[in-house]
Amino acid sequence: MSINHLLIVLGKRLNENKLTDEGISRVDALVGYLVELLVEESNQQTAVAFCGGVTKGQTLSEADAMHQYFRELEAQYEHPFKLGAILFEQRSTNTVENIQNLASEMIDSGLFTRGQSVKVTFISNDYHLQRIFEIQALMDEQGLLKVLIEKCSALGVELQIDRKLESHIPVPYPHQTTQGQLFLLMDVLTTYRVYLEGASAGAFQRDLDIVRKEPQRLSVEALVKAKELVGDSSLFGIVESLLPVLEHCIQQTPVDTDTKKVREYLALLDTNLTLLNRYLDPESDHTHRWWR
């Protein structure tokens, strides 16, 4: 019996080799989905892919940690889920690598045959999936889904990936604090970073004013909200000092900026977004040189 549905659980950085609240919520959502699916149909044509490698400071892969927790939850039910297959992508350290490496794992698994059509459902936290589909909609040239679809299509496997967020399994972000809100706002700027990456690489063969407009608008709105939040608190001095730097990166990269300058501001934006992502993530371990 061939696989016709692939559930992809995207990984989240571990803390002391343990799943964080985000990671736990993603596996909980997978199990909830499989339990409902069992009411309607067998899971034997469904495969699950756990994605995520070993990040710095850890010795366990995100994929392994999620799978272990998945088995713990499965054991609480009278019958196992009897999936068609479980795949592991354990070489990646970020979402881009998740998707790129997963395509290779799918092809190498031998589970998918030429001429086959496979429905794909992503499972992750809402902000994470929203960013993936937002980038795909605004800048298809830079989208991660395009890589996955094209790699599999080259071998005759057609992936059916709905571009609507609600067709997947977006799990509510678990941290409703000021820090959590700032983390989400900084994540919004990922879209502008991806725009700069595409612009510096010459990826866009269309009007750059149109390409840049929405990423720029989203980022400016996020920065305004972030300024309001840090202004109401004395706890985020580092964030407050870096917000003008991020704003400057956007202001100084209009569409007529030369490529060398775009790359310089991309480096500045990317470095500071990574720093703020790790600094603001409520699930980060800040005991060891976390900024590297």
Where are these regions (language model features)?
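A structural signal for short, hydrophobic/glycine-enriched beta-strand patches
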Residues: S2-R292
